[in-house]
């Protein structure tokens, strides 16, 4: 006698079905059109093949191609079709792995001759053929012995290695599409035809097997896929726009920074770039002062014993740089390390003097330079480096102060992003992971506070911020908020964090004296707004396409003389601009004025003031804005007043205007 399962549908209805009924049969029982459109089903939040039997009760949803969750299936299936196409065209090629990644997928291949960009066109054409065949995806469960034998016969040595690494108690799933098959966890759609034609192979790169430089180098083909052609076109257009805005190219054109092979992941800041960086620090320093933070500075190099106590040496050592004096008889037991994080140093500063509950909250902030090892292949301009500056802060407070501190941090973060022109912000609360420190009651209490804070933020900033909860995504030492902002071309960047920490205060025995004269462990909050300041500056450069707001621009105004007769007048204007705090310089070179304008425009100078004999006689200038061919004639007094106001940062403008 068949057992039945009870299923709850999105509309709230419930119904019993046979235990062995498949997802496809269930969809067909609802409607033939739904079965035709279905690509998978979700049971209790887990996506499954339509061919899978139901097997258990719970919440069920039929996933169609229009469902956002189908996009991962489309890309996953596309990766399989890519592998089949490659082996049809280049039979000697071994396949390895092909996961879905953000905005697409890739597949790594082993062959003597790496693929070229020209090969991608041929492979893409073959993929369209395979999709057109509309072969069904079919799953089989193989024994480990059978899988090893068959993949060994096919000379798929990387697959054999993968099979050997799979735990003995885990099923080996094999997915067929026609005669071609691959080792895969699934799930997949019904057939290759459901992938559609909205895909494109993007680039070829080298990649070490399993990311280990000691292993063979493979060829990685990257691709992207979408549910429809319009989404694909929009994505490709965004990539074109992103290439134009690439901060690495703009950094060269604007003379901001450079990198060298003998300092991989280390930034050589030029004068203009460093000025822009200092503008960020000056802005944040004022904001911190307004919010009663104390700026501190902890050592760059600390003994290994401190990192062992903090736990970093145990779980983060591979990302740290050791610092050992270059002395022949130096004791190897005495090892120092460059700090990868600022938090242990801040705990030491907090502990240095006895604190009463009346002293709390203590808010310690630092523009702390940290060093973290990143593989050379992961380095990317300012976005991914080995040495960077964090606008880090750590708040030590009582349990009763936690909610207010989180709300204060949120106000600071959102107002900061608004000052830089970011209007679309999302906030995610990540809750307890499976592996964690602290009791369940401690987590319950902290999460209840954070959820209450989230609701307050939702109410206060209704329509201004998107919120969500990510179960199980918190750090092992406490729940956290993550702030993500959207830039001018629709890309999302995770920047700010507010992280509750149960771990470090206990490890370092940090305490304060409560009103009953008893020792109490403070609540510790890690807080960052920019995150990596270098990365945030890279985001700003790309967001503004180098057209920085006047208050952020490293070189705000250039006064360009048309002829040598106007040189003295140009110097006079420049001096007056500098006197009111503007960053200005004169261009008195014996060059044509159009050449000067073009050169300074390429360097993204926001304002060019052109002056000649006529301007000198009338005590005026011709103002030209970056990105515009229009020229506006103004008196020097009007010009100075206009630029002085515009060059004022938003926070200073607020303080003046009240």
Curated annotation (Swiss-Prot):
Superkingdom of the source species: Bacteria
Q: Which GO terms describe its molecular function?
A: ATP binding; metal ion binding; threonine-tRNA ligase activity; tRNA binding
What is the UniProt remark on how the cofactor binds and its stoichiometry?
Answer: Binds 1 zinc ion per subunit.
Q: Does the keyword Magnesium apply?
A: no
- Reaction it catalyzes: tRNA(Thr) + L-threonine + ATP = L-threonyl-tRNA(Thr) + AMP + diphosphate + H(+)
Which portions of the sequence form the region Catalytic?
246-549
Required cofactors, per record? Zn(2+)
- InterPro entries per record: aa-tRNA-synt_IIb, aa-tRNA-synth_II, aa-tRNA-synth_II/BPL/LPL, Anticodon-bd, Anticodon-bd_dom_sf, Beta-grasp_dom_sf, TGS, TGS-like
Query: What cellular-component terms does GO give this entry?
Result: cytosol
CDD domains, from UniProt? TGS_ThrRS, ThrRS_anticodon, ThrRS_core
- Where does the TGS domain start and stop, copy by copy? 1-64
Its EC number(s): 6.1.1.3
| Biological process terms in GO annotation | threonyl-tRNA aminoacylation
Specify which residues bind Zn(2+) according to the UniProt entry for this protein: 343, 394, 526
Compartment(s) where it occurs, according to its Swiss-Prot or TrEMBL record:
Cytoplasm
Q: Does the keyword Ligase apply?
A: yes
Keywords (A to Z) from UniProt: Aminoacyl-tRNA synthetase, ATP-binding, Cytoplasm, Ligase, Metal-binding, Nucleotide-binding, Protein biosynthesis, RNA-binding, tRNA-binding, Zinc
The record's similarity note reads: Belongs to the class-II aminoacyl-tRNA synthetase family.
How this chain assembles, per its entry, is: Homodimer.
User: What's this protein's function?
Assistant: Catalyzes the attachment of threonine to tRNA(Thr) in a two-step reaction: L-threonine is first activated by ATP to form Thr-AMP and then transferred to the acceptor end of tRNA(Thr). Also edits incorrectly charged L-seryl-tRNA(Thr).
What is the name of the protein in this document?
Threonine--tRNA ligase
Protein source organism: Bartonella quintana (strain Toulouse)
Which taxonomic lineage does the organism of this UniProt entry have?
Answer: Bacteria, Pseudomonadati, Pseudomonadota, Alphaproteobacteria, Hyphomicrobiales
């Amino acid at each position: 006698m068949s057992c039945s399962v009870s299923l709850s549908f999105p509309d709230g209805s419930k119904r019993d079905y046979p235990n062995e009924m498949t997802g496809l049969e269930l969809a067909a029982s609802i409607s033939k059109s739904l079965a035709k459109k279905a690509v998978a089903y979700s049971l209790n939040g887990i996506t499954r093949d339509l061919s899978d039997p139901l097997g258990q009760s719970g919440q069920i949803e039929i996933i169609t191609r229009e469902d956002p969750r189908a996009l991962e299936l489309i890309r996953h299936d596309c990766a399989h079709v890519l592998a089949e196409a490659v082996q049809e065209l280049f039979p000697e090629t071994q396949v390895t792995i092909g996961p879905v990644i953000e905005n697409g997928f890739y597949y790594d291949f082993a062959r003597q001759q790496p693929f070229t960009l020209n090969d991608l066109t041929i492979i893409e054409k073959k993929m369209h053929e395979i999709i057109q065949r509309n072969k069904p995806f079919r799953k089989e469960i193989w024994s480990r012995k059978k899988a090893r034998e068959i993949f060994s016969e096919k000379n798929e040595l990387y697959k054999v290695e993968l099979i050997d690494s799979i735990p003995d108690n885990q099923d080996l799933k094999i997915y067929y599409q026609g005669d071609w098959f691959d080792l895969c966890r699934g799930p997949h759609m019904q057939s290759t035809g459901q992938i559609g034609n909205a895909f494109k192979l993007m680039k070829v790169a080298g990649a070490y097997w399993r990311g280990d430089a000691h292993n063979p180098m493979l060829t990685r083909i990257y691709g992207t896929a979408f549910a429809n052609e319009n989404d694909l076109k929009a994505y490709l257009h965004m990539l074109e726009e992103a290439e134009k805005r690439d901060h690495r190219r703009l950094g060269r054109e604007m003379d901001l920074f450079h990198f060298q092979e003998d300092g991989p992941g280390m930034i050589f800041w030029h004068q203009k770039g460093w000025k822009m960086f200092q503008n960020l620090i000056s802005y944040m320093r004022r904001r911190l002062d307004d919010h009663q933070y104390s700026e501190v500075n902890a050592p760059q190099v600390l003994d290994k014993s401190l990192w062992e106590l903090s736990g970093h040496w145990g779980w983060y050592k591979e990302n740290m740089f050791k610092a050992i004096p270059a002395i022949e008889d130096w004791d190897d037991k005495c090892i120092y390390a460059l700090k990868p994080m600022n938090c242990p140093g801040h705990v030491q500063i907090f502990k240095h003097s006895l604190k009463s509950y009346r002293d709390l909250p203590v808010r310690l902030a630092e523009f702390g330079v940290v060093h973290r090892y990143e593989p050379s292949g992961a380095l990317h301009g300012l976005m991914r480096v080995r040495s960077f500056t964090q606008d880090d802060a750590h708040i030590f407070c009582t349990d009763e102060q936690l909610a207010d501190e989180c709300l204060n941090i949120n106000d600071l973060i959102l107002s900061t992003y608004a000052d830089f022109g970011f209007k679309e912000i999302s906030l995610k609360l990540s809750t307890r992971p499976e592996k964690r420190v602290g009791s369940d009651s401690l987590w319950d209490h902290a999460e209840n506070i954070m959820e209450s804070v989230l609701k307050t933020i939702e109410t206060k900033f209704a329509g201004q911020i998107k919120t969500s909860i990510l179960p199980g995504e918190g750090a092992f030492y406490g729940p956290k908020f993550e702030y993500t902002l959207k830039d001018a071309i629709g890309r999302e960047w995770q920047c700010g964090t507010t992280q509750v920490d149960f771990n470090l205060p206990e490890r370092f025995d940090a305490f304060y004296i409560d009103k009953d004269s008893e020792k109490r462990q403070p609540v510790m909050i890690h807080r960052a707004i920019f995150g990596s300041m270098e990365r945030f500056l890279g985001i700003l450069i790309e967001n503004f396409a180098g057209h920085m707001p006047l208050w952020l621009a490293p070189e705000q105004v250039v006064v360009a003389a048309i002829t040598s007769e106007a040189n003295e007048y140009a110097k006079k204007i420049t001096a007056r601009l500098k006197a009111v705090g503007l960053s200005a310089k004169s261009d008195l070179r014996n060059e044509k004025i159009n050449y000067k304008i073009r050169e300074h425009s390429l360097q993204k100078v926001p304002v060019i003031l052109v002056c000649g004999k006529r301007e000198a006689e009338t005590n005026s200038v011709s103002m030209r804005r970056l990105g515009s061919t229009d020229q506006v004639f103004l008196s020097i007094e009007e010009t100075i007043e206009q630029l002085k106001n515009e060059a004022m940062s938003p926070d200073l403008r607020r303080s003046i205007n009240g």
